[in-house]
Amino acid sequence: MAVIAGLGTYLPKPRQSAADIAGASGLPEAVVRDKLGIHSKPVPGPEDHVSTMAARASRAALADAGLEAQVVDTVVCINEEHKDYPVWTSGIQLAHDIGAKRAYAFDIGQKCGSGVLGLKLAADMLHADPHLDTALVAGGYRNSDLIDYSDPDVRFLYNLGAGAGAAVVRRSGPGHTLLGSSFVTDGSFAGDVLVPVGGSRAPLTPDNVGEYRLQVRDMAGMRERMASRSVPNFLHVLREAVARSGAQVADLRHVAMLHTKRSAHDAILAELGLGPEHSIYLADYGHIGQVDGFLSLQLAAQQGRLRRGDLVVIVAAGIGYVWNAICLRWEGGDAA
């Protein structure tokens, strides 16, 4: 079975604090910290472009695996759509930047669920194609650029930050074994959260350039639908991924969960019969899109929370909407 042989992340140095967000949005700082669950978050510096950050995380993952870039057969690029340039296959640039000269590269997208999708796709490719031995799953994120803090409808997106994550996935050998996964998509949310201009439906013009930001079209309707579907869908993909791994929820030792509001995070753990010791709440990082799962794994390893043989699940969600999860069996030492 395919294994994660190395993990890497990159976080920009600039940070935005709860006080900064409160000042920009008009919310009380206590609401930002306690309800939204944001103490601070990394935001991009002048040179922290999506492809640049992805390359830095990729080099860290390769170093963690003890491998050179030349051994990579394919680059599964999970860069966010908001990247260096529009209409651009950023994975090809990523492969070039890290020196993966043998690899073919491509981009995939499932918004903040792209990390889980990338791991599953890499494992499936290695299983199906005998000519592939090593895949790199990597991508960066900086959708914090697209947030207008004066818009209360995107308050649930005030946690968006910046950074990158990467995983070296190999056909076999030492590493953390990838197990079962589960996905749910619900297209009834497809038109709810988007940038309304800059595409073929509403081309960018001098008059509408100010609308180039993430917006919610029907906040009341979306909130009502989410209330009945989001937590149940999180629980469904978690439980199904665990079951497809031949395990039980009680076997879980770490839930690498995306950053969401504290009440939702706690509700998911409680429904699973797990406690706060089974996860890390990313209050000091915010939501770095598809990177959250990679970051949570690294933090858990660095904090000594993971031991050989532990069952771990990465769980994510992305606007559109998707909920997904993938399990792995932790094998050995701390991630770098």
Regions picked out by a protein language model, each given a short descriptive name:
Residues 25-34, 85-99, 137-146, 206-210, ...:
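Acidic-glycine-rich active-site phosphate/pyrophosphate-binding loop
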Residues 2-47, 53:
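N-terminal glycine-rich anion-binding loop in soluble enzyme alpha/beta folds
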Residues 38-40, 74-76, 96-109, 146-151, ...:
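Glycine/charged-rich beta-loop-alpha catalytic/anionic-binding loops adjacent to active sites
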Residues 1-20, 116-189, 297-336:
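Conserved beta-strand-centric core segments of catalytic alpha/beta enzyme folds
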Residues 71, 75-85:
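Short beta-strand-loop/turn "lid" adjacent to the catalytic site in phosphate-handling enzymes
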Residues 51, 55, 82-83, 87, ...:
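Claisen-condensing/thiolase-fold acyl-transfer catalytic domains that form or cleave C-C bonds
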Residues 68-74, 102-104, 133-134, 248-253, ...:
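Short acidic capping loops at alpha-helix termini that bridge into adjacent secondary structure
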Residues 55, 59-62, 153-282, 334-335:
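Hydrophobic pocket-lining "lid/loop/helix" segments that shape and contact the acyl-thioester
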